[in-house]
C-alpha cells in the first residue's frame, strides 16, 4: 500500500511537534495493558509511526519490532528512537516474525477500510502471535457518531510553531455512511509563503459489537473493550486507573487474547 503524500507523515519531526507526547503516555498505557495480562517480552508495534511508543516499550525491557508503511517515519525512528528493530510492513497483510503481543495505536487499525482489509490484518495478527498472545489496539469509536454531530458541525482549527514557522490546519470531518468511513479533509497553511496544501484521508468506523464479533471470528477472546481512560481520552489515563464499563465516548480501546489451539 503506497501512502498518499501527507505533510505530517512525510515530515516526522513536524508530526512529533504537532502531536507531542513528552510523558510517553501512549507507551505507558500500552505497557500497563501488557503487564496486566502477563504478556511475554516480544512485541510488534504495527503502525509504529515515529517510533516513540516502540522505543518506550523497548526501554522498559521488551524486545520490540516497530513496523510501518512510511519509509520516512521508519528512517526517523531508527535515528531518534533507537532500541527497537524497525521494518517496513503493511497493515493489510504482514509477516515479520512471531511475537507475544501486537500493538496497534492511534487509530492505525482504522486504515483498514474494507472488510477484506480487516480480515487480512487480523489473519496477519493471528499468524504473528504465539498461542495466548495479546492484541492491544486504540482507535476512534464509530459508535460516538451515532446521533452526534459535534465533531462534524464545525471545522477544527489548530496551529503550532516549528522551527520559527507557524503551521495552521483546518480540519473537516464527514461521515460516509455507505462506506462506513469517517473522511477527513485537512488544509495546511503557513506563514512562510508556502502555498496551501489540502490532504484527504479516512478511517473505518467500527462499532463495539462489530469489533467484538470480528475479533471472536478470528479466534480472539476479548478481555477489555471500553471507551477509556486511554492515552487520547479526556481526562487521560494515568497509572492505577482501571477501564470503564462503557463504550460511549469518542475513543475505543481493546485488549484481546489469541485462543490457544485445541
What kind of region is each of these model predictions?
Residues 1-49:
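Conserved class I S-adenosyl-L-methionine
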Residues 51-93:
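Class I SAM-dependent methyltransferase SAM/SAH-binding core
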Residues 92-101:
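A short acidic, Gly/Pro-enriched loop at the edge of an enzyme's catalytic core
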Residues 100-116:
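A short SAM/SAH-binding and catalytic strip from SAM-dependent methyltransferases
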Residues 119-131:
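A short glycine-rich, Lys/Arg-flanked "PGG" loop and its adjoining helix->strand segment in the class I
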Residues 136-213:
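SAM-dependent methyltransferase
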Residues 205-262:
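C-terminal lobe and adjacent flexible extensions of AdoMet/dcAdoMet transferase-like proteins
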Amino acid at each position: 500500500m503506497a501512502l498518499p503524500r501527507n505533510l505530517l507523515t512525510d515530515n516526522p519531526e513536524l508530526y512529533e511537534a504537532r502531536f507531542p507526547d513528552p510523558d510517553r503516555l501512549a507507551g505507558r498505557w500500552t505497557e500497563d495493558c501488557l503487564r496486566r495480562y502477563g504478556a511475554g517480552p516480544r512485541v510488534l508495534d504495527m503502525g509504529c509511526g515515529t517510533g516513540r511508543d516502540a522505543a518506550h516499550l523497548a526501554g522498559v525491557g521488551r524486545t520490540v519490532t516497530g513496523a510501518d508503511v512510511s519509509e520516512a517515519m521508519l528512517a526517523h525512528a531508527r535515528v531518534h528512537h533507537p532500541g527497537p528493530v524497525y521494518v517496513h510492513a503493511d497493515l493489510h497483510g504482514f509477516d515479520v516474525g512471531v511475537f507475544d503481543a501486537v500493538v496497534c495505536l492511534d487509530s492505525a487499525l482504522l486504515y483498514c477500510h474494507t472488510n477484506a482489509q480487516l480480515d487480512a490484518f487480523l489473519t496477519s495478527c493471528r499468524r504473528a502471535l504465539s498461542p495466548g498472545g495479546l492484541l492491544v489496539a486504540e482507535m476512534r469509536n464509530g459508535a460516538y457518531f451515532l446521533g452526534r454531530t459535534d465533531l462534524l458541525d464545525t471545522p477544527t482549527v489548530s496551529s503550532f510553531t516549528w522551527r520559527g514557522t507557524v503551521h495552521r490546519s483546518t480540519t473537516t470531518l464527514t461521515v460516509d455512511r455507505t462506506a462506513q468511513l469517517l473522511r477527513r479533509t485537512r488544509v495546511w497553511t503557513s506563514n512562510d509563503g508556502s502555498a496551501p496544501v489540502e490532504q484527504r484521508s479516512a478511517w473505518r468506523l467500527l462499532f463495539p459489537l462489530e469489533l467484538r464479533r470480528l475479533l471472536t471470528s478470528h479466534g480472539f477472546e476479548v478481555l477489555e473493550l471500553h471507551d477509556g481512560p486511554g492515552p487520547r481520552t479526556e481526562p487521560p489515563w494515568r497509572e492505577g486507573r482501571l477501564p470503564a464499563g462503557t463504550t460511549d465516548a469518542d475513543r475505543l480501546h481493546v485488549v484481546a487474547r489469541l485462543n490457544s489451539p485445541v
